[in-house]
């Protein structure tokens, strides 16, 4: 590929949303945003936040909520793209997801990109009282969420 056709390499930062005993059980993202990210801010094009209810080692690990975290990061770092890594479609009703995404897009001045998936952590679904359907049903639900989001973002009077 010719140099003129190449896109510049871009870097994203995946937020460590979990806390641990070394962080005094506070989410590590808070410390990194305070001390580390300001010194390297010019080197990252995007920031990504995972959408889970708890960590992978124990349900008692502190884990920050993804939408609130991205909104906080949008306010602290006004020059980077923002995305979930990856939003679980089954955790929220589709119309609410579309509204939350549209709101963050406005507040961030068009720096938000909706990263969404079918969901895979059955333990999180059941712990919060959500149904955890088969993969084929979750993929069909994902398709519906994307359709509903697009309709709500582009139509004056959407219907599904």
Residue ranges of predicted features:
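Hydrophobic faces of well-ordered beta-strands that scaffold small-molecule active sites
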Residues: 11-15, 47-49, 81-84, 112-116
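Alpha-helix-loop-beta-strand connector modules within alpha/beta enzyme cores
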Residues: 60-84, 141-152
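N-terminal beta1-alpha1-beta2 module of alpha/beta enzyme domains
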Residues: 1-76
């Amino acid at each position: 590929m010719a140099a003129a056709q190449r896109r510049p390499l871009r870097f994203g930062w995946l937020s460590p949303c979990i806390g641990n005993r070394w962080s005094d059980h506070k989410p590590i993202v808070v410390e990194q945003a305070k001390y580390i990210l300001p010194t390297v801010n010019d080197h990252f094009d995007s920031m990504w936040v995972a959408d889970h209810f708890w960590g992978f080692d124990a349900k008692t690990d502190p884990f920050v909520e993804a939408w609130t975290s991205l909104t906080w990061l949008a306010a602290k770092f006004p020059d980077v793209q923002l995305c979930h890594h990856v939003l679980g479609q089954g955790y929220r009703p589709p119309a609410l997801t579309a509204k939350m995404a549209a709101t963050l897009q406005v507040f961030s001045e068009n720096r938000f990109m909706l990263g969404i998936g079918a969901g895979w952590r059955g333990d999180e679904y059941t712990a919060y009282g959500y149904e955890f359907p088969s993969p084929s049903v979750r993929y069909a639900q994902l398709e519906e969420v994307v359709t509903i989001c697009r309709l709500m973002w582009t139509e004056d009077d959407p219907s599904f």
